[in-house]
């Protein structure tokens, strides 16, 4: 878990009780508690004691956004499962879990110091878009998907799809249709197809704000949306950010688009559970819907604020939704044309 904006406070007694039950806290008086901000789905604390520094994460029933966005708190259980599985199959690619309280739906996990675990979103914001990092992220994500595709024991740990629908498909695709009635049919069709395609264990929130650049490779955090799902979602969810960053840091557009390209190549090289072209085709068709959802869905990206920039996203996404591409570089080509208008 990364350290973002800090605000010292005191947690409630229920949280304190869980930590004491876990043996991770003796007296709260002797510990330092700090709220970690930056996310919308959970209450997150950094806890410092004489013996250990760690994070506590408790899922919220209503997400911290303007829209009414609710999701089952049981997602905390599946985040824990995802982290433990990835810790076994790809050591170092997820935070270590120390404790999970099934009753209160909170977990305690490893704290990853920002000094050697840079937040990828912050790096991209500052124009440090190293294609090697994108290649590494694509390769690790692809390997996680590949290993999970053939492991029934992993698949049995994710019996639910309703959480993924509530926290991903509805807010990003279906809610977007309310502002684009002409695209309702295609957006709901994408939601349905994605929901019904479940060959691998997916993370569900693979944006750069949830990827830390560690000394031994990328570390994926905040896997609250984890489930058996469509790998195209994880890939598209990350790739759309390289497109959006072209508006945030225009001077680095070519580097962002290069990151897009190398991540695609590295990821597809790991695909083993189905034909690579099938994964790429679904990703290319889904990406425009998620792209549009970051402007007109329930969780609009905070750095695209000018109406002219929003309209660029809308035009490009609409064209691609109406005439779906089968290759991901076709999406890049359309976006380049829009940026140069």
PLM regions and their residue ranges:
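ATP/Mg2+ or Mg2+-diphosphate-binding catalytic cores
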Residues: 3, 251-254, 290-341
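ATP-binding pocket architecture of kinase catalytic cores
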Residues: 36, 41-153
């Amino acid at each position: 878990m990364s350290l973002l904006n800090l605000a010292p406070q005191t947690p409630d007694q229920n949280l304190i009780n869980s930590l004491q039950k876990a043996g991770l806290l003796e007296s709260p008086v002797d510990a330092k508690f700090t709220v970690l901000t930056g996310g919308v789905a959970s209450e997150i604390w950094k806890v410092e004691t004489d013996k250990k520094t760690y994070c506590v994460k408790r899922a919220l029933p209503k997400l911290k956004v303007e829209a009414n966005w609710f999701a089952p708190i049981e997602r905390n259980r599946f985040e824990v499962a995802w982290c433990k599985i990835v810790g076994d199959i790809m050591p170092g690619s997820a935070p270590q879990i120390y404790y999970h309280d099934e009753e209160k739906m909170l977990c305690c996990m490893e704290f990853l110091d920002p000094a050697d675990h840079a937040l990828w979103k912050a790096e991209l914001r500052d124009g440090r878009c190293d294609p090697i990092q994108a290649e590494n992220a694509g390769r690790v994500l692809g390997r996680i998907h590949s290993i999970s595709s053939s492991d029934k024991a992993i698949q049995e740990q994710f019996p639910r799809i309703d959480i993924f629908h509530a926290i991903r498909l509805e807010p990003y695709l279906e809610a977007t249709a309310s502002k684009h009635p002409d695209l309702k049919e295609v957006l709901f069709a994408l939601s349905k197809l994605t929901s019904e395609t479940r060959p691998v264990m997916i993370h569900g929130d693979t944006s750069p704000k949830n990827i830390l650049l560690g000394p031994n490779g990328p570390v994926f955090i905040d896997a609250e949306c984890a489930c058996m799902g469509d790998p195209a979602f994880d890939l598209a969810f990350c790739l759309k950010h390289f497109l959006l960053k072209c508006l945030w840091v225009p001077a680095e557009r070519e580097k962002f688009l290069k990151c897009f390209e190398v991540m695609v190549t590295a990821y597809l090289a790991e695909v083993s559970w189905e034909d690579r072209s099938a994964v790429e085709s679904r990703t290319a068709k889904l990406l425009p819907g998620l792209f549009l959802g970051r402007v007109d869905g329930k969780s609009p990206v905070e750095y695209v604020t000018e109406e002219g920039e929003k309209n660029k996203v809308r035009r490009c996404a609409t064209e691609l939704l109406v005439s779906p591409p089968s290759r991901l570089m076709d999406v890049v080509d359309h976006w380049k044309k829009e940026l140069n208008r």
